[in-house]
Amino acid sequence: MKTNKLYECTAIIDGGLQDEAVAATLAMVQRVITEKGGTINSVLDLGRRKTAYPIKKKSMGYYVHIEFNAAAPVIAEIERVLRYEEELLRYLIIQLTTPLLEMRKRVEKYSVVLGSVEEGASTSGDAEGSNE
């Protein structure tokens, strides 16, 4: 019996492509995941960013993060297809384990708490600047 596990795929698409080509490449990645038996849970579009170092002689990349459920044997098939896509500069698929999910929940909880403190500090700083 094949049980589905939770995975995440972070992909860097060539940043030099037009928006339509980037959207087509993203749609292709999603199609590959669903055709191979995966179920996409969420897609986080991080946009164009400068890479830390040149990848395939490119310094700009379009970052996308996809969470999906799939059976373990399907991952090798997905990677086999993605490996030969020229538009993808890099990709990484990892399994989301319970400790990693728990750590994410803690980070989200603390970022909400810290975010509200930082927002309060910035509004009080704005009020002081307007009095001058």
Curated annotation (Swiss-Prot):
The keyword DNA repair does not apply. GO terms for molecular function: small ribosomal subunit rRNA binding; structural constituent of ribosome. Transmembrane segments: none annotated. Pfam families: Ribosomal_S6. GO terms for cellular component: cytoplasm; ribonucleoprotein complex; ribosome. GO terms for biological process: translation. InterPro entries: Ribosomal_bS6, Ribosomal_bS6_sf, Ribosomal_S6_plastid/chlpt, Transl_elong_EF1B/ribsomal_bS6. Keywords: Ribonucleoprotein, Ribosomal protein, RNA-binding, rRNA-binding. The keyword RNA-binding applies. Binds together with bS18 to 16S ribosomal RNA. Belongs to the bacterial ribosomal protein bS6 family. NCBIfam families: S6. HAMAP family: Ribosomal_bS6 (MF_00360). This is Small ribosomal subunit protein bS6. It comes from Chlorobium chlorochromatii (strain CaD3). The gene is rpsF.
